[in-house]
Curated annotation (Swiss-Prot):
<comment type="similarity">
    <text>Belongs to the methyltransferase superfamily. RsmH family.</text>
</comment>
<dbReference type="GO" id="GO:0070475">
    <property type="term" value="P:rRNA base methylation"/>
</dbReference>
<feature type="binding site">
    <location>
        <begin position="39"/>
        <end position="41"/>
    </location>
    <ligand>
        <name>S-adenosyl-L-methionine</name>
    </ligand>
</feature>
<feature type="binding site">
    <location>
        <position position="106"/>
    </location>
    <ligand>
        <name>S-adenosyl-L-methionine</name>
    </ligand>
</feature>
<dbReference type="GO" id="GO:0005737">
    <property type="term" value="C:cytoplasm"/>
</dbReference>
<dbReference type="InterPro" id="IPR023397">
    <property type="entry name" value="SAM-dep_MeTrfase_MraW_recog"/>
</dbReference>
<keyword id="KW-0698">rRNA processing</keyword>
<keyword id="KW-0489">Methyltransferase</keyword>
<dbReference type="InterPro" id="IPR029063">
    <property type="entry name" value="SAM-dependent_MTases_sf"/>
</dbReference>
<feature type="binding site">
    <location>
        <position position="113"/>
    </location>
    <ligand>
        <name>S-adenosyl-L-methionine</name>
    </ligand>
</feature>
<dbReference type="Pfam" id="PF01795">
    <property type="entry name" value="Methyltransf_5"/>
</dbReference>
<protein>
    <recommendedName>
        <fullName>Ribosomal RNA small subunit methyltransferase H</fullName>
        <ecNumber>2.1.1.199</ecNumber>
    </recommendedName>
</protein>
<feature type="region of interest" description="Disordered">
    <location>
        <begin position="289"/>
        <end position="308"/>
    </location>
</feature>
<keyword id="KW-0808">Transferase</keyword>
<dbReference type="GO" id="GO:0071424">
    <property type="term" value="F:rRNA (cytosine-N4-)-methyltransferase activity"/>
</dbReference>
<feature type="binding site">
    <location>
        <position position="56"/>
    </location>
    <ligand>
        <name>S-adenosyl-L-methionine</name>
    </ligand>
</feature>
<dbReference type="InterPro" id="IPR002903">
    <property type="entry name" value="RsmH"/>
</dbReference>
Length: 329
């Protein structure tokens, strides 16, 4: 999956070798692919002899997975769950499974979704302003046409880290109604004075990228979903089980990093002016690995890998923590 919204490329799993090495799948292992998408990780895990429980809230991904499973000869070891990854525990319980040896997440929008103009995730091709991963609930157009200026600005700032969020929000309200991705992108570009005619290495990044990311995250509740999905993974991993999370922007990576660090027993630093209290936190993960980034060769081969970060950890035998289930504001 990828944070990029303006490029086209065939689906190539990001950090595939590194993810497989982190999960270390063995024949007979049960592994959750929490973000099935086009099945890139799942195929390699099946090749290693594991049974994969694949989750995806996108009905198109599940339909494609069923068709592939029927033709690849590995269908008995591929179990598809048309669910959000926050529902991993419930899906496994329905299948009679109490624990798994591995969980992998590939956070964000998938290459398949980006490359289908009708899904409305990208501005490289004009399409309806949709952006819903599950194809249910309010669309991006619903939000942009109905929310007030302040709410739109807050979403652009919080989820797109857009410093000019208020200027863009004013332009959106003035241009409503918006119905297509091209309209939305054009409004953002005009508001910020973006010049697409400037080419070459010094050309500025299309500012519509940040706004598309922000609206997509909001429409799909992606950060809250990530927090809940990580907590679900902690719950279903057996002692010695492994978690691998690939993220594509700083908002996601901060959540993953904090989750794994606190899971390994790290506690937020207190004030130097107050007495230090002894930590009683029981580590549910071994000390996580540092961030793993794509090699220059992979970035050249797959441009969508450029912003990817992989973080991994191993589950201990400690009981799972109680989680609030929402991303920090």
């Amino acid at each position: 999956m990828s944070a990029e919204t303006g490029s086209r490329a065939p689906h190539i799993p990001v950090l595939l070798e590194e993810v497989v090495a982190a999960l270390d799948p063995k024949p007979g292992d049960l592994i959750v692919d929490a973000t099935f998408g086009a099945g890139g990780y799942t195929r390699r895990l099946l090749d290693a002899g594991a049974t994969v429980h694949a989750f995806d809230r996108d009905p198109d991904a599940i339909a494609a997975g069923k068709l592939w499973g029927e033709t690849c000869g590995k269908e008995p070891r591929l179990v598809l769950h048309p669910r959000r990854f926050s529902e991993i525990a419930e899906g496994l319980a329905e299948a009679g499974i109490a624990g798994v040896q591995g969980v992998v997440f590939d956070i964000g929008v998938s290459s398949m979704q980006l490359d289908q103009a009708a899904r409305g995730f990208a501005f490289s091709s004009d399409g309806p302003l949709d952006m819903r991963m599950s194809q249910e609930g309010p669309s991006a157009a619903d939000f942009l046409n109905e929310a007030d200026e302040g709410e739109i600005a807050d979403v652009l700032y919080r989820y797109g880290e857009e410093r000019q969020s208020r200027r863009i929000a004013r332009a959106i309200v003035a241009a409503r109604p918006l119905t297509t991705t091209a309209q939305f992108a054009a409004v953002v570009r005009k508001a910020l004075g973006y010049r697409p005619d400037i080419k070459g290495p010094k050309a500025p990044k299309d500012p519509a990228t940040r706004s598309f990311q922000a609206v997509r995250i909001h429409v799909n509740g992606e950060l809250d979903e990530l927090v809940q999905g990580l907590a679900a993974a902690e719950k279903v991993l057996v002692p010695g089980g492994r978690i691998a999370v690939v993220s594509f922007h700083s908002l996601e990576d901060r959540i993953v990093k904090q989750f794994l660090r606190e899971g390994a027993g790290a506690v937020p630093a207190g004030s130097r002016h107050l007495p230090q209290l002894e930590s009683k936190v029981q580590a549910v993960f071994e000390k996580p690995s540092g961030a793993i980034r794509p090699t220059p060769e992979e970035e050249a081969r797959n441009p969508r890998a450029r912003s990817a970060t992989l973080r991994c950890a191993v589950r201990t035998a400690a009981p799972a923590r109680a989680h609030q289930g929402r991303a920090a504001a």
